[in-house]
Amino acid sequence: MKVWKAALIPAGACALTWLTIHGRRDHPGWGKIEHTRFAHRGLHCSGVPENSLAAFRLAAEAGCGAELDVHLTADGYLAVIHDSDLFRMCGVEARVEDLTAAQLGKLRLEGSGEPVPFLEQVVPLFEGRGPLLVELKCTGGNHAKLCEKTLECLDRFGADYCIESFDPRCLLWLRRNRPEVLRGQLTQDFLRRGEGQSVRNRLALTAMLCNGLTRPDFVACRYQDRRMPLLGLWRLWGGRTALWTIRTPDELAETERLGALAIFENIDLEKGEGK
């Protein structure tokens, strides 16, 4: 019995490793984005709010890609904003998912004249320009509808794009329904930062245990957690990576030395300086 118990430990470690490193390695779409620097929520700065049309125009004009966040409104529109809670960006006590597009359209970002944009307004800015990195923000089990609506919108335009999400259900939906779309699993050290989640979920998300089922094309990890052992195994076995959020020239250089995509903000790419 002791022998069997001892054997279970390395067997479990091997199974964990297999689940973590199991991704797709041969997607041709990677070649379209592998040398791209993605502006985190657009090229926002003083007077130009994050995830605003102005920030995305600046990113497109600079030749960058852009990372953005998508939520579903109550009536099924695709709002581009990071937080579900609108207080930080719009100063109102409401959630994106509880408002209609018309109600959301009356709000302004950070007291500016910039409205909360919709995905159909952002995507055309990048046709013939840099690619988009679209993060799906699921709430209340709406992952399937969010995936479907987002892909319907993206298909209407000619911009290059890839999809990422913290929620493995989005990646599984993409694998089953749109396998041709480049997909990425977002992760971080949830054991340190997973407040409000069960220990089981925090462990599973940190270890990327769903990779064996969802088979992501890349993993996007918080820059500060880039040395997580299981992320190292992913990279060792040829897995592609992106790192967020890059805020200094030194971090940018380190990210690209590792061969990872950089999702950056507050860096002047022409001068190589932080803003």
Question: Where do the model's predicted regions map?
Answer:
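Phosphate-group recognition and catalysis centered on beta-loop-alpha active-site segments
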Residues: 2-275
